[in-house]
A protein has these predicted regions:
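Classical Sec-dependent N-terminal signal peptides that target proteins to the secretory pathway
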Residues: 1-24
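N-terminal leader/linker segments that initiate helical-solenoid repeat arrays
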Residues: 17-83
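Generic helix N-cap/helix-start motif at coil->alpha-helix transitions
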Residues: 39-52, 77-86, 112-122, 157-164, ...
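Alpha-helical repeat scaffolds
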Residues: 64-73, 99-109, 132-149, 177-190, ...
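Residue-level signature for tetratricopeptide repeat
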Residues: 53-57, 91, 124-125, 170
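Alpha-helical adaptor scaffolds
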Residues: 87-96, 105-107, 115-160
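TPR/TPR-like alpha-solenoid helical repeat scaffolds
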Residues: 119-129, 154-173, 195-218
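Flexible helix-coil transition and linker loops at the boundaries of alpha-helical arrays
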Residues: 35-38, 70-81, 107-112, 144-158
């Protein structure tokens, strides 16, 4: 701080000649552009939340579907803001545009790590009946994502077990059947009844193909999203 204050007025004057001042036209225009961009971003998120709220109260599915489509058209195709990408992804999932949602999710994952989102990519691929090898690779990538997460969590933390479960489950879904025993080990590890029941239900969801299919059936999907 003292070094900054010690700069001479001459030095500051030279600096001002080579850079825009805070009240220069360029600075003002850039500030206004940023404010307008922020306002637009907030408008997209606000409208999405409003549609969801009304969908949960009085709005019918058809009206919500049309509003989602109209909102999607408002979002620029080259939008790169993380929060807007997340909102766009949610809209696409609601509309059943899973191929487009998959592409947007890849953009999100390039900006931020999320094991859950990575896992959903595999669900999308399964719903779209993509090549089994592509799905296997997706689950292995998910397992690696959970492994990275595990290494950042203290072992005593409750979410450590959830992340470990995610890693084992992804490996099992990738075809590594030896991880079935590791999943059972996590169930046996827990002696709190509520925790044990939660993991037992998750175990059933993985092992029971009907439970997995029921989950897939609940996801809307259309190959025509124009």
């Amino acid at each position: 701080m003292h070094k900054v204050l010690a700069f001479s007025l001459v030095s500051l004057g030279l600096s001002a000649c080579n850079n825009h001042t805070d009240d220069s036209p360029s600075k003002i225009i850039n500030t206004k552009d940023n404010q307008n961009q922020h306002k637009s971003n907030n408008n997209y998120i606000y409208e999405y939340n409003e549609i969801i709220y009304k969908l949960n109260t009085e709005q019918d599915q058809t009206t919500a579907h049309l509003r989602f489509k109209n909102l999607l058209k408002k979002i620029p195709s080259n939008e790169n803001n993380l929060n807007i990408l997340k909102t766009k992804r949610k809209i696409l999932v609601h509309l059943g545009c899973l191929n487009e949602a998959y592409i947007v999710t890849e953009k999100i994952l390039a900006k931020t790590d999320s094991s859950k989102l990575q896992e959903m990519q595999c669900i999308f691929l399964s719903k779209m009946k993509r090549d089994p090898y592509q799905i296997k690779e997706c689950y292995e990538e998910t397992a690696n994502s959970y492994l990275t997460e595990i290494n950042l969590i203290p072992k005593a933390a409750l979410r450590y077990q959830y992340a470990l479960w995610g890693h084992y489950a992804a490996m099992f879904n990738a075809g590594h059947i030896e991880y079935k025993d590791k999943l059972q080990e996590i169930i046996d590890y827990h002696n709190i009844e509520d925790h044990k029941k939660t993991y037992q239900q998750m175990y059933k969801n993985i092992m029971d193909p009907h439970a997995f299919q029921k989950r897939l059936d609940a996801i809307p999907y259309t190959s025509n999203c124009r």
